[in-house]
């Protein structure tokens, strides 16, 4: 059974879906005014992997992740660039899909936009006003935070603790410093929509509550996002949604840990701000994904050149194992009969992978399982005789596990197998003709392409190394 860490309770719990065999999952998406940075890539990769694993275990997953396509930062950036805000957000939504697509992140079943959900947002706020959980003030609408008795439960903060640090900013017309905005009155030159409270646009927090309700219902299985969203965003979502719907909003809350660069918080002021768009120009996107999955998702992760190089080398070793198994399958002359020992070992690793992922989606252990499979494949390839059934099983399980992790194990091979075979024949001919200079040149050419030659009792073998 899948166990996941619930941020609401602070402990691992068995996953029990609202509806047998189905998962309703909402993940907070980006505000689209720039390329996403590598910190944004972590939740995209993590929760894509969670989704993949649920699917692998037989669940039907409905996955919703929004785009905030109107807000203060978008409006400011559009004005600075002299660009229509619709054109700006459209451009960066396309960039988001391109960048996350390179990371093998599957598109959500639904990617709702705030600008296309405005009627639902307004209707949601109307219910809160009618119930007394929200109030209008000079064209703005605020949520009456003290009306929700469980406020602070997710972030484990009391109302009194929160009140001590709360302030009313200039221009705000709140009853209480703890209240937060649901609807902002229009400002000159900014996009606005007609509402019962006048022209305006929604606050940030209400958007996700309205979109989750529209596409997944009043109660969902899993709500997920980065650790930085726990407070105030997710806390406010809970208050709004449960006040509006009179039902529990989400049964499980999942939050991924922070990402630092070279042990420092990423920021433009430190000059270490790195977008995914920039990163994947220098690093194989699969290496970046593999790196992200090498650490358990709740733990902080440190992005550094050394750690990326380690991830690249590790992934290369696994890919080489796969390529060598594929190649050995073409060498039918020395294929023997299968032994239960090796088939059982492959199955043990697969089952351990499932155990790893059942334990709060522990991809760090799952990656280790992939290394173990690679190690066993290499040992098996060293046998004098290998069996087609075992080789095919190695490949099938490599494919199965890597698909769950979303990491592709195919590589650009350089020389094709038949080209390698021809060069080996040419080298053999040169040696027989005592043309050792040519034989050595061919050997060096093969070595430069990562081809290793070895003499065996069955003759010359080669592998990619």
Curated annotation (Swiss-Prot):
E.C. no: 6.1.1.16
GO molecular function: ATP binding; cysteine-tRNA ligase activity; zinc ion binding
Cofactor: Zn(2+)
Signal peptide residue numbers: none
Residues annotated as binding ATP: 268
Keyword Aminoacyl-tRNA synthetase: yes
Pfam families reported in the protein's UniProt record: CysS_C, DALR_2, tRNA-synt_1e
Residues annotated as binding Zn(2+): 28, 208, 233, 237
Domain of life: Bacteria
Cofactor note: Binds 1 zinc ion per subunit.
Keywords, alphabetical: Aminoacyl-tRNA synthetase, ATP-binding, Cytoplasm, Ligase, Metal-binding, Nucleotide-binding, Protein biosynthesis, Zinc
Biological process, per Gene Ontology: cysteinyl-tRNA aminoacylation
Reactions mediated catalytically: tRNA(Cys) + L-cysteine + ATP = L-cysteinyl-tRNA(Cys) + AMP + diphosphate
'KMSKS' region (motif): residue ranges: 265-269
NCBIfam families tied to this protein: cysS (TIGR00435)
Similarity field: Belongs to the class-I aminoacyl-tRNA synthetase family.
Protein's name in the database: Cysteine--tRNA ligase
Species: Exiguobacterium sibiricum (strain DSM 17290 / CCUG 55495 / CIP 109462 / JCM 13490 / 255-15)
């Amino acid at each position: 059974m899948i166990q996941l860490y619930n941020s609401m309770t602070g402990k691992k719990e068995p996953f029990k879906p609202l509806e047998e065999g189905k998962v309703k999952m909402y993940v907070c998406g980006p505000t689209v005014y720039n390329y996403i940075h590598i910190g944004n890539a972590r939740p995209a990769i993590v929760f894509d992997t969670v989704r993949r694993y649920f699917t692998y275990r037989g669940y039907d997953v409905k996955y919703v992740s929004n785009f905030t396509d109107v807000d203060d930062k978008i409006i400011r950036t559009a004005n600075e660039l002299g660009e229509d805000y619709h054109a700006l957000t459209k451009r960066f939504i396309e960039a988001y899909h391109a960048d996350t697509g390179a990371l093998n992140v599957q598109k959500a079943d639904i990617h709702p936009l705030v600008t296309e959900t405005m009627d639902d947002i307004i209707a949601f706020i109307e219910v809160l006003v009618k119930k007394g959980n929200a109030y209008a003030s000079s064209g703005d609408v605020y949520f009456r935070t003290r009306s929700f008795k469980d406020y602070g439960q997710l972030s484990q903060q009391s109302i009194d603790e929160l009140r001590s640090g709360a302030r009313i900013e200039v221009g705000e017309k709140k009853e209480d410093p703890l209240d937060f905005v649901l609807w902002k009155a229009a400002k000159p030159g900014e996009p606005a929509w007609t509402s019962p409270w006048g022209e305006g646009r929604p606050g940030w927090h209400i958007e996700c509550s309205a979109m989750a309700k529209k596409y997944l219902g009043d109660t969902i299985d899993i709500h997920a996002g980065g650790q930085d969203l726990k407070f105030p965003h997710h806390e406010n979502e809970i208050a709004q949604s449960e006040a509006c719907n009179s039902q529990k909003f989400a049964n499980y809350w999942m939050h991924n840990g922070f990402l630092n660069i070279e042990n420092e918080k990423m920021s433009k002021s430190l000059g270490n701000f790195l977008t995914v768009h920039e990163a994947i120009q220098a690093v194989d996107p699969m290496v970046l994904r593999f790196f992200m999955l090498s650490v358990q998702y709740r733990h902080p992760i440190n992005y550094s050149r050394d750690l990326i190089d380690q991830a690249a080398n590790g992934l290369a070793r696994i890919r080489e194992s796969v390529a060598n198994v594929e190649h050995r399958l073409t060498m039918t002359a020395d294929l023997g009969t299968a032994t239960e020992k090796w088939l059982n070992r492959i199955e043990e690793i697969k089952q351990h992978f499932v155990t790893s992922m059942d334990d709060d989606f522990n991809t760090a252990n799952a990656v280790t399982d992939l290394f173990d499979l690679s190690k066993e494949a290499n040992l098996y390839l060293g046998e004098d005789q290998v069996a087609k059934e075992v080789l095919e099983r190695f490949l099938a399980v490599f494919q199965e596990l890597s698909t769950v992790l979303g990491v592709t194990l195919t590589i650009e091979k350089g020389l094709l197998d038949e080209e390698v075979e021809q060069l080996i024949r040419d080298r053999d001919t040169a040696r027989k003709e005592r043309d050792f200079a040519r034989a050595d040149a061919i050997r060096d050419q093969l070595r430069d392409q990562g081809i290793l030659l070895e003499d065996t009792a069955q003759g010359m073998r080669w592998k990619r190394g």
